[in-house]
């Protein structure tokens, strides 16, 4: 979901930000991967609207299938964003654009779709993570890339159910005290209160750990001289979609709903 300007950081030993830009190339495969994730998201939201807003029965779309599809989409976007945080320039500008877009979505849903209000959605998360990764990188770069990926994978799995009050792995963990789940401020970090509702909710924890996993994947590619593998293959339709992710993301729901409304009105 992050755009980057096509300029890549040279492959230094540690893959540090700020290394001299030595060539102007684009990792086309990243665009294609974002395009694939976006198409899956459009498919999921179309299916969700058909079932939940237009009342069409779909017994085959089980909760397990829905969960796996949701996880694939969000993990793809967030990890790709963490990876791309090390490509290009102006991370704070990128963060402000994403947070600004999230404010627009909040305002639109508040006015036109209050029953599907979006508070602290994925764009807010990506904006916050994009702003935090630069200061955090000073600490993260000291960690071996493979070890860092493993550590933050475990941290994500251990905090995956923190929104529901549980911390730990299945069969090994504990429930957090209720006083942590106090208000919207705590909800931002991952501790939503009882009356908190959002149609798209991605709190800082646990999802920042997935973003950092993407950062370490970049490190692994950079330190092993593997970034060149992302220049091919060229799949131009997917690349185009991947480069327009933010605007497509912001427009896809009203377009889907409008198209479905016309279809069900006619048929």
Language-model segments: which ranges?
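Alpha-helical transmembrane segments and their immediate juxtamembrane cytosolic regions
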Residues: 2-267
């Amino acid at each position: 979901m992050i755009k980057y300007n096509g300029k890549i950081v040279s492959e230094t030993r540690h893959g540090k930000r700020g290394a001299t830009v030595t060539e102007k190339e684009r990792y086309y495969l990243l665009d294609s991967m974002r395009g694939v994730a976006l198409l899956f998201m459009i498919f999921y939201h179309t299916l969700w609207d058909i079932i939940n807003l237009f009342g069409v029965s779909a017994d085959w779309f089980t909760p397990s299938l829905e969960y796996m599809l949701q996880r694939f989409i969000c993990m793809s976007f967030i990890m790709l964003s963490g990876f791309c945080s090390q490509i290009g320039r102006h991370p704070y500008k990128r963060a402000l654009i994403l947070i600004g877009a999230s404010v627009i979505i909040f305002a639109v849903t508040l006015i036109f779709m209050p029953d599907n209000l979006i508070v602290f959605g994925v764009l807010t998360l990506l904006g916050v993570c994009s702003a935090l990764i630069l200061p955090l990188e000073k600490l993260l770069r000291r960690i071996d890339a493979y070890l860092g990926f493993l550590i933050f994978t475990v941290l994500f799995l251990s905090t995956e159910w923190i929104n529901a009050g549980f911390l730990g792995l299945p069969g090994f963990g504990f429930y957090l005290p209720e006083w942590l789940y106090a208000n919207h401020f705590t909800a931002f970090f991952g501790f939503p209160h009882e009356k908190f509702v959002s149609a798209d909710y991605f709190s800082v924890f646990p999802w920042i750990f997935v973003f950092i996993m993407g950062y370490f994947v970049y490190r692994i590619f950079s330190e092993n001289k593997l970034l060149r593998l992302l220049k091919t293959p060229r799949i131009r339709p997917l690349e185009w979609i991947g480069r327009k992710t933010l605007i497509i993301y912001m427009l896809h729901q009203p377009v889907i709903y409008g198209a479905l409304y016309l279809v069900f009105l006619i048929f």
